[in-house]
Design a protein with these regions (language model features):
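ATP/NTP-dependent adenylation/nucleotidyl-transfer catalytic domains that generate, transfer
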Residues: 1-18, 24-41, 48-68, 72-189
Length: 189
């Protein structure tokens, strides 16, 4: 994009040292969910950094999640990569994002790259973590939207359908507005 548009800038920041400091300060290795909590902290450090630069430049932070990620499986960190001001592609299925990218002339290596959240110190992909590809999850999401249930499928289709439903249920709290405790009027005075 930088080569095509004069108003596009990029900065490379190595946040590893900052993350290591956070990890040293807060990590409780004996806790069962320590690894996931640290991975989510890495995502939130990225968000903090993006908002720092957005604030410096009076910009908004744009999300990169598509409909399958954001509303199908909820595969993002709350107040991390999900902490954005606008979500320009959140109403598009992954296949639609790829089609638009092709139309825009985006490099095919980017279009076909295996999605990864980059939160771990290894090469695991989103598919490794979820147990299904985005093509499979998109299929399952469409089937669910069409009123299908687990009993309509067998084999891998049933497995993928259940993966989508399981992730969706576990991550539903990310997909709905923050609950507000409504205080009765007689208690406010």
């Amino acid at each position: 994009l930088k080569s095509k548009y004069s108003n596009v800038e990029s900065k490379y920041l190595d946040l590893a040292k900052s993350f290591d400091e956070i990890k040293t300060s807060i990590s409780i290795a004996s806790k069962k969910n320590n690894e996931l909590a640290l991975a989510n902290s890495r995502s939130r450090l990225r968000m903090l950094t993006l908002y720092y630069f957005a604030s410096l430049n009076n910009f908004l932070v744009a999300g990169t999640g598509n409909k399958v990620e954001d509303f199908g499986v909820g595969f993002y960190t709350k107040y991390g990569d999900g902490g954005v001001d606008l979500s320009p592609i959140a109403d598009l299925m992954k296949s639609e994002v790829r089609s638009i990218a092709k139309e825009m002339g985006i490099n095919n290596d980017i279009i076909i790259a295996e999605p990864t959240d980059g939160l771990w110190d290894d090469t695991r992909t989103d598919e490794n973590q979820i147990g299904a590809s985005y093509n499979e999850l998109e299929w399952a999401m469409n089937e669910l939207d069409n009123g299908k249930s687990e009993s309509d499928f067998s084999g891998r289709e049933k497995e993928v359908f259940n993966i989508l439903k399981s992730f969706n249920a576990a991550n539903k709290h990310k997909m709905v507005p923050i609950p507000i405790c409504e205080i009765p009027e007689n208690l406010k005075n």
